[in-house]
Amino acid sequence: MNLKKYFIRVLHRLQKGPGYTYKELLVWYCDNTNTHGPKRIIREGPKKKFIWFFLTLLFASLVFWQWGILITTYLSYSVSSSLSIGFKTMKFPAVTVCNASPFKYSKVRHLLRELDELTEAALERILQSKNRDATSALPLNSSETPSQTLNLRLWNQIPLVLIDESDPERPVIIDLFETDESGSGAQPNNSSPALVNVTSEAKKQKVAMKLCSRKALPNCIYRNFTSAAQAVTEWYILQSTSIFAKIPRNETVEMGYQPEDMILACLYGAEPCSYRNFTPIYHPDHGNCYIFNWGKDEEALFSSNPGAEFGLKLILDISQQDYIPYLTSTAGARLMLHEQRSFPFLKDLGIYAMSGTETSIGVLVDELERMGFPYSDCTMNGSDVPVKNLYNEYNTTYSIQACLRSCFQAQMFETCGCGHYLFPLPEGVSYCNSEDDPDWAYCYSSLRSSIGHRQFCIDSCKETCNDIQYKMTISMADWPSEASEEFQYMQHPLTYERDQSRNATLDRNGIIKLNIYFQEYNYRTISESAATTIVWLLSSLGGQFGFWMGGSVLCLIEFGEIIIDFLWITVIKISNWGKGLKQKRARAQYPDAPPTVSELVEAHINL
Amino acid sequence: MAPPYHGDTREFSMAPAKKIKAKIKKTLPVTGPQAPTVSELMHWYCMNTNTHGCRRIVVSRGRLRKFIWILLTLSAVGLILWQCAELIMSYYTASVSVTVQFQKLPFPAVTICNINPYKYSAMKEHLSELDKETKNALETLYGFSEGKSKVRRDAADWNSTGRNMQSKLLEKIPLLKFDDLFKKTATEILSGHKRKIEGSAFHQGSSMVNIGEPQDVVGFQLCDPNNSSDCAVYIFSSGVNAIQEWYKLHYMNIMAQIPLEMKVNMGYSAEDLLLTCFFDGISCDSRNFTPFHHPLYGNCYTFNSGENGTILTTSTGGSEYGLQVVLYVEEADYNPFLVTSTGAKIIVHDQDEYPFIEDIGTEIETAMATSIGMHFTRSHKLSQPYSDCTETGNDIPVANLYNKSYSLQICLHSCFQRAMVDTCGCAQYAQPLPPGAEYCNYKKYPNWMYCYYKLHEKFVKEQLGCQQICKESCSFKEWTLTTSLAQWPSSVSEDWMLRVLSWDKRQKINKMLNKTDLANLVVFYKDLNERFISENPANNLVILLSNFGGQLGLWMSCSMVCVIEIIEVFFIDSFSIVMRRRWQKMKKWWNDRKAPRPQEPPQVNAPAKEGHDNPVCTDEDLPTFNTALRLPLPQENHMPRTPPPNYSTLQLNAAFTDQLPDTLEGRSH
């Protein structure tokens, strides 16, 4: 009903034309609006009118300009950070302890026997070469060298060579176990020209690793080393990796250090704990690792007091005598503090603890809480990262290290067709070993030194929004003390507890004491909050509008109303004008003035 | 409006414009800027202004209410002023933001030094005398002997070796054993002479540390050679400290006279120091290290110094991808008196930074693997006016003696060196030479030590003004280090490791290495997260203005327009009114003097009163003179603004056309 009435009124208005002009409307608006400027325009004399008109325009444009700035500020999503420091009851960090050596030598000796003999012989060769004339080939002295008994199968896969550079133009490459002497046909090649300059004046002889691809053309690269020690270590790691890759997981776990052998004593606060409180995890770098307070199956432990008395105290035995001699030259325990339910990446974030010492570690949890998209480019749980997290098999949370390793493993599978032993396997892929994939070392070596591949992984992985760093204050002291009574006193009970034997099997080279505790200030949290919220934006917009013109949202609505009125007038005017045009046109058919009645009558009569 | 020439004719027979004016004045309420009195103007202002309080004052009935409103309005004004002042004062505050970015990181420069500066075997000839003297001193003090005879060699023996100067120097500043601090007597340890101590100043511990028995006190005395009564005596609670300080003093004197090339030759070469080097999975060697001569640590080597224009980057975290070096520190060739610890010193720094290894170095133990994990943090502060820091150091009046970018430490050292050159005439050995100066030595500057010690004391007590001149730099890079140690080589790998490393070293020395001569060092990025802590201005002009606007709007609904209005009304209009009234008074006074006859009251006031009583202005929004002419308000003033305008009434046929038919005529002139 109302609608109909309304339309009728609209129609009437259309027919009658607008009741007022643009000027009237404008004047009325100026007089009645709540913004401050326009009123002055119509109230003042011509000079002031002009000034006020100009001022109003200026202020209006200022308002719009500043609004623009405010809105762009808002859309930049800046954040403000707040820092808090103090002590509070916090989750005790998960503590991963490993042995630097992944396996017990006594248990893997049968696997490594061939390789060790080979290494021994190669070392002999290298050391012999010292006094020889370098240009002459190393003679295979059959009476001395054990090469007949050696199985050169492993050697031939990845041989070590000696590069003689006494003549820098023609380096002579000598395979340690072969008599054939290849000239400079194969170019010693290294991926980083910044680091290695082939024409060396410092060392005349260097050891290099020969990595060959047998797939396509026999294509070999030589990985140069300035130090023979480094070369032998790297070579041994490659070879042993290939050997261990073939062994199924449950057997490798057997070969490592068992929890009861490694963790001798444990005390958390005042409560005793034992190796049973540790979650075992198989870490490819370090063999069996044990994680305290991982929070997987049970609730995480809290610590509500600072100081060593309330922290974790451990006594470990690393049995250094059982280390694999060529694989790890560094002896000690590897440990790392990390978040609950996260995978320990010991190579990146771990620290060493030295045998024969007591290591005290005061912990400060340095946390950075960030806001996700659009404030920062970080990921909350890794679900939006295009890399499949292979560490999901450990049921751990996303971390940047996990992403990078997964990315590398994916690339490894893509280029080499097999997975690297140090990283988890994607589905349906097996670990690389020299028998099934003879090219893998070549392939791995080139992939590892490729900058492009690394950059790809850096670009695809995102850091987590909550970044926790455990800041450690490490101090060390000799332990057990030299006083022999005390050492005996420590040694015997611990040995007895472990082996039920009266003979002391522990020695200073093996045992480590660890104290891990919260510092007096145990957290430092930097948290982000949005610097510009919508409330901030509105109040700033209001402030600007108010400051220049005393306006508010209602003023904007008023203005909108006037514009509608304007349009309405225009519509009416156009419709009237159209009507007028029609009439004119209708009139235009008769060029003369319309005939008067008399004329009509006349015409009629004339007819 | 009326053309200007009409105004000139008003004195004489009524021009038509004048007539009109008079007529208008009679009928119209004359208010606004043209109001005749200031109070009229104020009234008009209060009624018409857009601010809220003022109108209430005028409109309210009753004195109390008026008073309250005046109070409220004034307090609102006060609040606005206060709050705006607060806003302005807090304009220069900074907010801190922390961003973390995961990216390829530049590897820092790593400077490695042997703790022992020079090979003792090479230094021996320069130091033989000093060492002999020191040994003797130790023997005398502690009855310690090296199995040699305790017989002191006499001075003549030294002189025959042809180094008169040094022995003279040693005689000049001998070690003293203080027999009685109160009687001020001391024995020269070497010669056994008793002597009286003239100096009054006792330093280094006498005030802070309680020294047990005064008989045990050892020290030395520095005197101003020109004035032997002006002496400073340095005593130490421990003879070891005293001897070391004393040894260092003489050592620096001797070193200052040796030319740089010779010193470099006496130090360790890069091949000596570095056994193996491995970075990011690739071998490196001594050529990747840039030599750098440190006055106290001899030859140091900087990895990745960026000297050849490229700075290495790390694109993977973890120990395998960092810098791994095995250092060879030749323990047997150490100077027994100068350094008492064994190992190397390293510092992680930016390529542009000077490595202050003596101040902030990390020591590396031998027979150990030291693994250093790094986190990278970059920070930037805002400079003036937010905080007192310097961006480039160019605004600091201290010349940078180091060839590196500015830092606070560089400034302090440079400042001290400058003061040293100004006061003592020569430069201190541990810092670089300013242009035109030379290092202090006893030959040329016999009193430099005394001067140096005095100056250094002043410097420490902040009397030199260096601490005031030097500002911290605004941006800095920091590598947080986590250092941990492990045994290396492990007992089972020791054998082959040492054999192969000896083979590596074969060009230099032909012997089996000992593990106490070796140190393994790994420096790596723990993760590639770069933390960037930066200060940003918390305010800018836009935000300040919107805060102003918020304050003005909150308390008074005021705006910039109101402020201009206030300026207009209170300053321009009131001023003009006051002036006008002055002018009229003057005119009246002039007219009165000219014609003392009583005259009509001045015309101006009358119409104003009339205007007020005019029935037209029952409306609260009084039309002004101008608006009245042009745009009269509708007559039904009871609700002047509310309904949409009755547009037909806005025609110019308003009230005055019939009353003033001659207005139009006058204008059409």
UniProtKB/Swiss-Prot annotation, chain A:
Activity control, per UniProt = Originally identified and characterized by its inhibition by the diuretic drug amiloride.
Q: Which Gene3D superfamilies match?
A: Acid-sensing ion channels like domains, YojJ-like
The cellular location(s) given in this protein's UniProt record come to: Apical cell membrane; Cytoplasmic vesicle membrane
GO terms (BP aspect): aldosterone metabolic process; artery smooth muscle contraction; cellular response to acidic pH; cellular response to aldosterone; epithelial fluid transport; erythrocyte homeostasis; gene expression; intracellular sodium ion homeostasis
Predominant location category: membrane
The residues on the Cytoplasmic side of the membrane are 1-50, 573-607
A GO molecular function assigned to this protein is: ligand-gated sodium channel activity
Keyword terms of this UniProt record = Cell membrane, Cytoplasmic vesicle, Disulfide bond, Ion channel, Ion transport, Membrane, Sodium, Sodium channel, Sodium transport, Transmembrane, Transmembrane helix, Transport
Q: Which gene encodes it?
A: SCNN1B
Q: Which organism is it from?
A: Pelodiscus sinensis
Family in the record: Belongs to the amiloride-sensitive sodium channel (TC 1.A.6) family. SCNN1B subfamily.
Give the bilayer topology.
Multi-pass membrane protein
Q: List the disulfide bonds.
A: 98-289, 212-220, 266-273, 378-465, 403-461, 407-457, 416-443, 418-432
Q: Keyword Ion transport, does the record have it?
A: yes
The UniProt entry, under Pfam families, shows: ASC
Q: Name one GO cellular component term.
A: apical plasma membrane
* Extracellular topological domain residue ranges: 72-551
Identification of the protein by name: Epithelial sodium channel subunit beta
UniProtKB/Swiss-Prot annotation, chain B:
Q: Which residues lie on this side of the membrane: Cytoplasmic?
A: 1-67, 573-669
Q: Quaternary state and partners of this protein?
A: Component of the heterotrimeric epithelial sodium channel (ENaC) composed of an alpha/SCNN1A, a beta/SCNN1B and a gamma/SCNN1G subunit.
Q: How is its activity regulated?
A: Originally identified and characterized by its inhibition by the diuretic drug amiloride.
Question: Which taxonomic lineage does the organism of this UniProt entry have?
Answer: Eukaryota, Metazoa, Chordata, Craniata, Vertebrata
* UniProt GO cellular component terms: apical plasma membrane; external side of plasma membrane; extracellular exosome; nucleoplasm; sodium channel complex
Q: Which residues lie on this side of the membrane: Extracellular?
A: 89-551
Q: Which organism is it from?
A: Pelodiscus sinensis
Q: What is this protein called?
A: Epithelial sodium channel subunit gamma
Instruction: Name the protein family.
Output: Belongs to the amiloride-sensitive sodium channel (TC 1.A.6) family. SCNN1G subfamily.
List all membrane-crossing ranges.
Answer: 68-88, 552-572
Where does the protein principally reside? membrane
Its Gene Ontology molecular function terms?
A: ligand-gated sodium channel activity; WW domain binding
Please name the NCBIfam families in this protein's record.
Answer: ENaC (TIGR00859)
Q: Does the keyword Transport apply?
A: yes
Region annotation Disordered: residue ranges? Answer: 592-619
- What PANTHER family does the record point to? AMILORIDE-SENSITIVE SODIUM CHANNEL SUBUNIT GAMMA, AMILORIDE-SENSITIVE SODIUM CHANNEL-RELATED
Q: Gene encoding it?
A: SCNN1G
Intrachain S-S bonds: 113-300, 223-231, 277-284, 389-474, 411-470, 415-466, 424-451, 426-440
Q: Quick check: keyword Transmembrane helix in the entry?
A: yes
Q: How does it sit in the membrane?
A: Multi-pass membrane protein
Name the catalysed reactions: Na(+)(in) = Na(+)(out)
Q: Name one GO biological process term.
A: intracellular sodium ion homeostasis
Query: What's one Pfam family the UniProt record gives for this protein?
Result: ASC
Cellular compartment(s): Apical cell membrane
Q: What does this protein do?
A: This is one of the three pore-forming subunits of the heterotrimeric epithelial sodium channel (ENaC), a critical regulator of sodium balance and fluid homeostasis. ENaC operates in epithelial tissues, where it mediates the electrodiffusion of sodium ions from extracellular fluid through the apical membrane of cells, with water following osmotically.
User: Which keywords has UniProt assigned to this entry?
Assistant: Cell membrane, Disulfide bond, Ion channel, Ion transport, Membrane, Sodium, Sodium channel, Sodium transport, Transmembrane, Transmembrane helix, Transport
